[in-house]
């Protein structure tokens, strides 16, 4: 849709985001997990979603690989396509936040500018940047998908951490040590959500 199309008008809904939050019993936010491939983003996000589900919190997990099977199946891994991938996911996450959900997203999202773009779209207070900080050597040793091996062999181009840059967050809301146990990292995130009055259970 062209930004200048005057025939497309925003339609307000009778049920507000605040009313949806009241219905759910918690605030709507997005936890944006970022880090290298193999850092543990999806694993920690999945562990947190499971813990929140047990507490009765309404959640949804958007995973980097999964969205490329549908929403972003037409995109490659050029800088332009990666930016569009993050833009689309940011828009979906924002809609889910307005629905009152706690949204967890697990994406490498290597560039600060793109993460900032989503932060501005969702709004301060509703965007929690989660940096899963795991050394490259550990990520390579894990290599659950064999991608680092392919990148080192020259079979995979533009791979983050090898021949494509990863810009680490400078002021993430929470900085996780990706070498710790997943249960410890999940507990740190639960503590953060409670401290910020996002969940009460």
From Swiss-Prot:
The gene is cysC. Residues 1-23 are annotated as: Disordered. One of its GO terms (biological process) is hydrogen sulfide biosynthetic process. It comes from Escherichia coli O6:K15:H31 (strain 536 / UPEC). One of its GO terms (molecular function) is ATP binding. This is Adenylyl-sulfate kinase. It is an enzyme of class 2 (transferase). Catalyzes the synthesis of activated sulfate. Pathway: Sulfur metabolism; hydrogen sulfide biosynthesis; sulfite from sulfate: step 2/3. CDD domains: APSK. Keywords: ATP-binding, Kinase, Nucleotide-binding, Phosphoprotein, Transferase. SUPFAM superfamilies: P-loop containing nucleoside triphosphate hydrolases (SSF52540). Its EC number is 2.7.1.25. It catalyses: adenosine 5'-phosphosulfate + ATP = 3'-phosphoadenylyl sulfate + ADP + H(+). InterPro entries: APS_kinase, P-loop_NTPase. Belongs to the APS kinase family. ATP binds at residues 35-42. The active site is at residue 109.
């Amino acid at each position: 849709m062209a930004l200048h199309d005057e025939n497309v008008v925003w339609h307000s809904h009778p049920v507000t985001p605040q009313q949806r939050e009241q219905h759910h019993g918690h605030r709507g936010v997005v936890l944006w997990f970022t880090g290298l491939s193999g850092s543990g983003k999806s694993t920690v996000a999945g562990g947190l979603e499971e813990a929140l589900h047990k507490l009765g919190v309404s959640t949804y997990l958007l995973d980097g690989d999964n969205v490329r099977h549908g929403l972003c199946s037409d995109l490659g891994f050029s800088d332009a396509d990666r930016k569009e991938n993050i833009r689309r996911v940011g828009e979906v996450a924002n809609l889910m936040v307005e629905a009152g959900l706690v949204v967890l997203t697990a994406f490498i999202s290597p560039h600060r500018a793109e993460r900032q773009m989503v932060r501005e779209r969702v709004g301060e207070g509703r965007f929690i940047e989660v940096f899963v900080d795991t050394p490259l050597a550990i990520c390579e040793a894990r290599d659950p998908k064999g991608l680092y091996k392919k990148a080192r062999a020259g079979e995979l181009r533009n791979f983050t951490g090898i021949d494509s840059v990863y810009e680490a967050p400078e002021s993430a809301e929470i900085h996780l040590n990706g070498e710790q146990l997943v249960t410890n990292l999940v507990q740190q995130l639960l503590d953060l959500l409670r401290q910020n009055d996002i969940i009460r259970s």
